[in-house]
Amino acid sequence: MAVVGAGPNGLTAAALLARAGFQVDVFEQADDVGGACASAERFPGATVDLGAAAHPFGVASPVFQALELERFGLTWRHPCIPLAHPLDDAPAALLHRNLEATASGLGRDERAWLRIHRHLVEHIDAHLANVLGPMLRVPPHPVALTRFGLPAMWSARALGHVAFREDAARALLAGSAAHVSVPLSGPLTASFGLLLNALGMASGWPVAEGGSGAITRALAAVVEAHGGRIYLGQRITSLRQLPARMVVLSLTPRQVLELDVELPQHVRRRLARWRYGPGSYKIDYLLDAPVPWADPEVGSAGTVHVGGTLDEIHRAEASVAAGTMPKRPFVLVCQQQLADPSRATTGHIVWAYTHVPRGYDEPEPGYVEHLVTQQIERFAPGFSSCIVDAHRTTASDLERWNPNLVGGDIAGGSMAGLQALLRPGPGLAPYTLSKHRVYLASAATPPGAGVHGMAGAWAARAVIRDA
């Protein structure tokens, strides 16, 4: 049994297959495991996350829990406040690891927030069982799916304006929905915001102690503990290179089509229709002091959504989708050091990224970095003067680092419309490319983007079923 790609999904598939008794060999092109869930020393004595940073899906992932990653070195660290969303001339909106505490800070929207989120938070495991898998199946918890589906079908923009009366609650919904880099007027975009916020209130938005790479190192340790082998620096161009009858590919459609592999023509056509989304542009900052947020509460939040009101975030994401870089982009900021002081021996590390149009070229190097810095400065006056050093990673840089991030698309393919649900296309066997031979386990399969390993888990299930 061979697995190509040692990111979270590939390693999860390998771990489950090794546990089930398969002899598993994992082949990874890079010099270390991790894929887009990795970390490294970017500044002297400072560890930064190269891709994913905060992990609401990771800490709640059913398969990560089943694999008992904490036994293999993973430790979750929680900040005092999971998420903050600063606003102009108003207190920041705060998402606490508690439903009632969050709602009590939302003024006139307290009751509406409780009404919309209570079932999600109190039955989060049932909701995750429904959504972290193929959509074309009988849901394990149909009543819960119906309860979630009614508000989830809305656009985030419409639900925010209809359900809430004030900017704070609307902003919390919009910021979390914007993670998938889709205009907030699109159908189903409310679902992303609702689910991420429910996860934050139920189990938090923690970071991995020592860096996000600790998650994939723990997965690799599970693989090896059950007799699996991991080969690094191995670029696979043909399945004939692999000494295995069955292969799991933790790749997106473009990489699959570039391989020398026999696939049915209808599968090739389906993969060729795959659409990639906007890119991401990442900046790591080294500061000589904590971020001077105008609202001090934001200084206790592990994740910060920087973008202003719901309508402002919608305009920014719509602009990106239309091919224009907004002057005021939506920015995701992570302050991992608050929960994990081991991240830096001196100074303060801040991780930030924004969405950029697909194929975007900066008018000059550092232009997007300047826009991101300005947005943070808007809610943290004096931020710029705290910067000791900064390292930018463009969308093109992301793809060079990890070919699965095509055009800097960190979701493995657009999460807009039906492609968010039917990945990598319509069909009852999304993880099977060629039965008894080739399987797919990446963010291009359900449930899509996020560090949760569930695509790998479902692919492993398909292999075990067919074997």
Sequence positions of predicted segments:
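N-terminal glycine-rich phosphate/pyrophosphate-binding loop and immediately adjacent elements
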Residues: M1-A126
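Hydrophobic anchor at the start of a short beta-strand
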Residues: F22-V24, V247, I283, S385
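A conserved FAD-binding loop/helix module that cradles the flavin
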Residues: A52, A441-I464
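Rossmann-like flavin
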Residues: D88-L188
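Conserved FAD/dinucleotide-binding core of flavoprotein oxidoreductases
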Residues: A101-S104, R254-E258, L286, T345-Q375
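A glycine-rich dinucleotide-binding beta-alpha-beta segment and adjacent secondary-structure elements
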Residues: E166-P183, R328-L332, G382-P446
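Helical element adjacent to the flavin cofactor pocket in flavoenzyme catalytic cores
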Residues: L195-T237
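Mid-domain catalytic core of redox enzymes
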Residues: L232-A344
